[in-house]
A protein has these predicted regions:
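PLP-dependent amino-acid enzyme catalytic core
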Residues: 1-488
Length: 488
């Protein structure tokens, strides 16, 4: 199997090379030439690690001994034996993706990505040091830092928007330990940060960074996206095993969405054979995806809002490019759309393509007040505590269920622990909020009895190690400077 750029199908790479590079030379994203269709029914009988290895082997067939990579990636890192528990809450199900070492769904992929990159490096015969560049809207950063910490032959720089992540998310990153990690705040929003990283990939060559190869831990890297496909199959298998559905029944998934990677993984699962019903795209006040899926017009020329669900505060959803490539198969068309987005800030898809999009995806959005009401209501009725991102998805799922009433089970993806956003959650419960984030954590625990994840509780004792703040125009110079330093 070959991977090809979304913008030029002639630019191909092996699966391992695609994982190593992260992004294609023309700025496009790597996609498999064809998505493999699995004997998904046989997967229903497998444990999570075996299921993961089989799915990833189909997508990345040149990797040897995927089961061993999966075991090493996940061994001892998650707080529950079930990596991604599915729980019944009221009239729907919640897929808990926050049981990993940093309490966010990114752990599922970023526990494994270092294994994939390390083996790809060996397979490609690369002796250069790998420098992982990552832009984060909050959760990817810490998960990537933890995943790549002290991995031999690898360094990682994480950029995050200054003032654009929660206090807990920031504390997770700036206290990060490891001899190969750097964290830097960028004055601007996540889109500025993500665009800066993409420009570095586009502009740097071997002469700029001798002895160094760049790669990415963002979901622009297919090695980050692929492991997320697994938990859709696993959630479906859990429903079958529990007798809630029969094999072949459809299931809807509602996904809080910013960069479109998590929900795209669900579409991959569907294309690989899983009986997915609707994929429901849930946005916060930054509702560029809701508008796009409703009208076919993608327009980033709009006000950027800082919300209580900061990991979704995104106006340029990178993985949407992959979906457009999948639905059209036309690299020149996709390249033209991305050119329009970059140069004039918007594009419009054809009516035919909009119909294809709407045949697969539903959408909705809500603001912070609606999400807060949902947090309070779900706790009062179900004694289930959810974070603001999950609350956005729950609210949009409410809209969908009210409109359709088709009796098909709905799974809400819960992407982060409520303790990553304790101020927003405690406030939503009608409680007074202190200035100190750790005091708020304690108050939230006292109010609900829900345990604080150990990795978050321990943050209050950790010293700050990373204090760099730069302008977005200085990101390239920062990378060149740090890449040239022997010791971090």
């Amino acid at each position: 199997m070959k991977y090809q750029s979304t913008r030029n199908h002639a630019l191909t790479a092996s699966p391992a090379a695609a994982v190593l590079r992260g992004i294609a030379p023309d700025g496009g994203l790597y996609m498999p030439e064809a998505i493999p269709v699995l004997d998904w029914q046989s997967l229903m009988k497998e444990d999570t690690l075996t299921m993961s290895a089989r799915i990833l082997s189909a997508l990345l067939p040149d990797y040897e001994d995927m089961p061993a990579l999966v075991r090493r990636g996940y061994a001892g890192k998650f707080e529950t034996e079930d990596l991604t528990p599915l729980v019944s809450v009221g009239d729907r199900y919640v897929l808990e993706l926050f049981r990993g070492p940093t309490s966010a769904f990114k752990d599922v992929a970023l526990s494994l990505l270092p294994q994939l990159i390390s083996q790809a490096r060996d397979m490609e015969g690369i002796e250069d040091e790998m420098l992982i560049l990552t832009a984060t809207s909050g959760d990817t950063g810490k998960a990537a830092l933890e995943g790549f910490r002290d991995v031999p032959g690898t360094k990682i720089i994480v950029f995050y928007p200054h003032g654009g992540v929660s206090a807990v998310q920031q504390a997770q990153m700036v206290t990060q330990e490891g001899g190969n990690v750097k964290v830097c705040a960028v004055r601007g929003n996540f889109d500025d940060t993500q665009t800066g990283v993409k420009r570095i990939f586009a502009s740097c060559d071997e002469e700029d960074l001798p002895g160094v190869r760049l790669s990415s831990a963002n979901s622009i890297n297919i090695g980050r996206l692929a492991p997320q496909i697994v938990y859709y199959f696993k959630a479906y298998a859990d429903l079958v095993r529990s007798g809630r559905i029969r094999v072949g029944d459809k299931v809807h998934f509602c996904v809080p969405t910013g960069n479109f990677g998590d929900i795209l993984a669900g579409y991959f699962a569907k294309r690989m054979g899983l009986p997915v019903g609707r994929l429901i795209c849930a946005s916060n006040r930054n509702d560029v995806l809701t508008d796009f899926l409703s009208t076919g017009v993608y327009d980033k020329r709009r006000t950027f809002y800082k919300t209580t669900s900061p990991s979704m505060d995104i106006l340029v959803s990178s993985n949407l490019e992959r979906l457009l490539s999948l639905l059209t198969g036309d690299d020149a068309y996709v390249s033209g759309l991305m050119k329009d987005l970059n140069e004039v800030g918007h594009y419009k898809v054809t009516d035919e393509l909009l119909q294809k999009l709407q045949a697969e995806f539903s959408c909705g959005c809500c603001d912070d007040d609606a999400a807060a009401r949902t947090i309070g209501r779900v706790w009062a009725r179900e004694k289930y505590l959810c974070d603001p991102h999950t609350a956005v998805a729950w609210t949009v799922a409410d809209q969908f269920i009210h409109m359709h009433r088709d009796g098909v089970p709905v799974v809400v993806l819960s992407t982060a622990s409520p303790y990553k956003f304790p101020t927003a959650v405690l406030s939503a419960l009608g409680q007074r909020v202190a200035d100190d984030e750790f005091a708020v954590m304690d108050a939230l625990h006292a109010c609900t009895g829900v345990p604080v994840p150990k990795n978050l509780a321990s943050l209050r004792q950790k010293p700050v190690r990373h204090t760099d703040v730069i302008d977005r125009e200085d990101m390239l110079d920062y990378v060149l400077q740090k890449a040239g330093e022997a010791q971090w």
